[in-house]
């Protein structure tokens, strides 16, 4: 009887997990509720005992050894995913922030879709965090899943934001991508991601932004948000493509 109860409990847990995952797919705003194609094109991370894995751990140890308090605080400040962290490269003035609520709503929906797709890949690979593999690494932030290192969700978010905003404001593309580089690298500064996690997150963002562009609902919402943004930073409407 005990064995039957255990099997029933496990089955129920699996059903609940599957149900929760399916429910999350229903929350997608722009992308189709099918992450399989995305996950299939994500290359696997370096093997656990490979020279590349060792090199990436050594790189993180070197970053940790050289890390200053200012770098630590900057990395901690980038822990939250917030479109306002990219206002600097856009030249958004404080007085204009309130007018950008429609942009924030749009980007929150983009982030939601990106997050659902990237989490599907994280579950597929279940890569342990660097500090799990190398105890000498002391992360400067907590509250991250120990086995969801690859791809980096922060990297995917940062590059998705930069690429979407660069489509709206191509005049600031270089500055936006530089901010995304910094945003993503801060995850290595804190010791919670390998370099290959960051690279995979960027590739995921590039793939997803292309897919966003195929969806009519996304294109309409992006056009509206772009108008709001360009008006707020005193730029003329983006030329028609």
Where are these regions (language model features)?
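Short alpha-helical linear motifs
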Residues: 128-131, 158-160, 198-206, 226-229
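Hydrophobic alpha-helical bundle signature of multipass membrane enzymes
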Residues: 21-189, 221
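Acidic, carboxylate-rich catalytic segments that either coordinate divalent cations
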Residues: 213-241
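N-terminal Sec-pathway targeting helices
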Residues: 1-13
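Hydrophobic h-region of N-terminal signal peptides that target proteins for export
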Residues: 14-20
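Interfacial helix-loop-helix junctions of multi-pass membrane proteins
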Residues: 182-213
């Amino acid at each position: 009887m005990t064995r039957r109860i255990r099997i029933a409990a496990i089955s129920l847990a699996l059903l609940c997990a599957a149900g929760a995952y399916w429910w999350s797919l229903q929350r997608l705003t722009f992308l189709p509720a099918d992450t399989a194609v995305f996950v299939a094109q994500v290359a696997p991370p370096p093997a656990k005992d490979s020279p590349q894995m060792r090199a990436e751990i050594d790189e993180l140890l070197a970053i940790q050894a050289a890390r200053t308090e200012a770098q630590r605080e900057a990395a901690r400040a980038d822990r939250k995913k917030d479109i306002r962290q990219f206002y600097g490269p856009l030249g958004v003035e404080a007085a204009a922030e309130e007018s950008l609520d429609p942009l924030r709503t749009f980007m929150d929906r983009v982030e939601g879709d990106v997050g659902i797709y990237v989490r599907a890949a994280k579950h597929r690979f279940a890569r342990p965090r660097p500090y799990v593999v190398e105890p000498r690494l002391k992360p400067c932030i907590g509250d991250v899943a120990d086995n969801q290192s690859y791809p980096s969700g922060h990297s995917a978010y940062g590059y998705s934001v930069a690429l979407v905003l660069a489509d709206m404001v191509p005049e600031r593309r270089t500055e936006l991508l530089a901010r995304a580089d910094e945003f993503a690298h801060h995850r290595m500064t804190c010791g919670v991601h390998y370099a290959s996690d960051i690279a995979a997150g960027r590739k995921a963002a590039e793939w997803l932004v292309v897919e966003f562009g195929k969806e009519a609902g996304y294109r309409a919402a992006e056009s509206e948000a772009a108008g709001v943004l360009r008006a707020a930073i005193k730029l003329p409407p983006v030329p028609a493509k």
